[in-house]
Amino acid sequence: MPFLGLIFLFIFLFFPEISFGYKIFLISLPDNYGALKKEKTFYVGAAEPAFGLILDLKTPKNLYVLLPNGTTEKPTFLKTEFFDRSLNTKRVGYNFKFTPNNEGDHLVCLESDYTLLRDKTVGKFLVKTPLHVLKENKEPTLCGFDLEIKPYTRPYGFKKHGVFWGQVWYQNKPLSSGEIEVEYFSPVFLREEDLPKDSYGQINYPYLKNKVRLSKNGFFVVSFENPGWWVITVKVRSGEKTYGNQKYPFYLIHHLWIYVFSDKKEQNTYEYFEPRSN
């Protein structure tokens, strides 16, 4: 095991609070725009996005695309491999292809299986990614998750320093307290020398992951500093769940993936899987 891989293994085993960084990504390349009758490839996997660490992902429990007319389509996803450069090993992931047949805003929605996390909690991940196809919907659409971010800013077409305004809903009501986390998906694995440092030379974790408290009505505002993919995360304790023969605290964890365009013509290339132009 490479030395740097041992460093990250130590960090995530002995500092479990950092495990909030475990995310399920649901992204397409080069961005979240589509065209009529043009096939689009999506990638599904697990990662510590800020560090560019790729992890294995259990088979998703449910995956569907919410179409502009309110109906759903269930694409067939296939198991594939992504490459984790921290340990120089292959990781289990998935991809699927989707061809838009309608103009308007689509939502790609995913529900994970129950996952035992490093901090000895069980999580169920509820993930959504907007796909814009030529025409803007008048009303925001939702996947219908128990925990979900409702956008008050159009969730696509962002550029650097763009601002997003949203509201968190839990069981059909605005969430009255909590926090959201905003994290950039690094297109490359960040080696130790690449990580941001504070004035004492220690890894600057707050710089990598921004956190914002919710208002009493569940509202929040965030901005995106870099072009590429970002994930907004919120989690809520929802009782306990038996996993194996033991009970663990159970959390619903919701991700909203947002793409930010560059001011320049070049696009981010993610080294974990082969870039595609469709």
Report the location of each language-model feature:
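Start-of-domain marker
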Residues: 21-82
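Short tyrosine-centred short linear motifs in exposed loops/low-complexity segments
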Residues: 37, 92, 99-108, 116, ...
